[in-house]
UniProtKB/Swiss-Prot annotation:
Subunit structure: Heterodimer of a subunit A and a subunit B.
PANTHER family tied to this protein: KETOACID-COENZYME A TRANSFERASE, SUCCINYL-COA:3-KETOACID COENZYME A TRANSFERASE SUBUNIT B-RELATED
Name of this chain's protein: Probable succinyl-CoA:3-ketoacid coenzyme A transferase subunit B
Signal peptide (UniProt feature, chain positions): none
Naturally occurring in which organism (per UniProt): Bacillus subtilis (strain 168)
The keyword Transferase belongs to this UniProt entry's keyword annotation: yes
Catalytic residue positions: E47
Entries under NCBIfam families matching the protein: pcaJ_scoB_fam
Length: 216
């Protein structure tokens, strides 16, 4: 795993508290499952009908019938349960998921999220993201701060089709952590070795800076 991804995943793990029901989105968020510390008991949910996902299996121990929503092989923890999609989405839409950690393509300064398609490119579909951003109690997004062309993915307004409006509570990038309250974006943490000036330079969105960052 790249060092930048490791930093984001390890920071995302800090969002998980003992006793939570948590959904991990497809892609980088699924790596969080391997980093949950001993003694923190959570139930990880997948939209395809499993509550109680464990870490990725070791090579040679994979069960091809045991997969997550991204079709990756997984393990299960003691007490895991299986159910159909109707029950899975009833959990999500009914507000029974405490935290969803999702990937992102773009996030706006008001907390809008675009994470499901790029026009003109083949996509599998929306999946459960739209349900999660409206049903889960808390939404944390993890993504790289800029795209492969060096353009900011933290935007004034999202240019890609939205998954949800004003749904993001916290954004974790390889540069910084931002919180969203009442449509206002605030820089609350810097990743190691990153300066406020670098964040300004690589962020299209307008944002405030918390006193704790200014004092650090």
């Amino acid at each position: 795993m790249k060092e930048a991804r490791k930093r984001m995943v390890k920071r995302a793990v800090q969002e998980i508290k003992d006793g939570m029901n948590v959904n991990l989105g497809i892609g980088m968020p699924t790596l969080v499952a391997n980093e949950i510390p001993d003694g923190v008991h959570v139930m990880l949910q997948s939209e395809n009908g499993l509550l109680g996902i464990g870490p990725y299996p070791l090579e040679g121990t994979e069960d091809a019938d045991l997969i997550n929503a991204g079709k990756e092989t997984i393990t299960e923890v003691t007490g895991a349960s299986y159910f159909d999609s109707a029950e899975s989405f009833a959990m999500i839409r009914g507000g029974h998921i405490d935290l969803a950690i999702l990937g992102g393509m773009e996030v706006s300064e008001q907390g809008d999220l675009a994470n499901w398609m790029i026009p003109g490119k083949m996509v599998k579909g929306m999946g459960g993201a739209m349900d999660l951003v409206n049903g889960a109690k808390r939404i944390v997004v993890i993504m790289e701060h800029v795209n492969k062309h060096g353009e900011s993915k933290v935007k004034k307004t999202c240019s890609l089709p939205l998954t949800g409006q004003k749904v993001v509570h916290r954004l974790i990038t390889d540069l910084a952590v931002f919180d969203f309250v009442n449509g206002r974006m605030t820089l609350t943490e810097l990743q190691d070795g990153v300066t406020i000036e670098e964040v300004y330079e690589k962020t299209e969105a307008d944002f405030a800076v918390s006193q704790s960052v200014l004092n650090s």
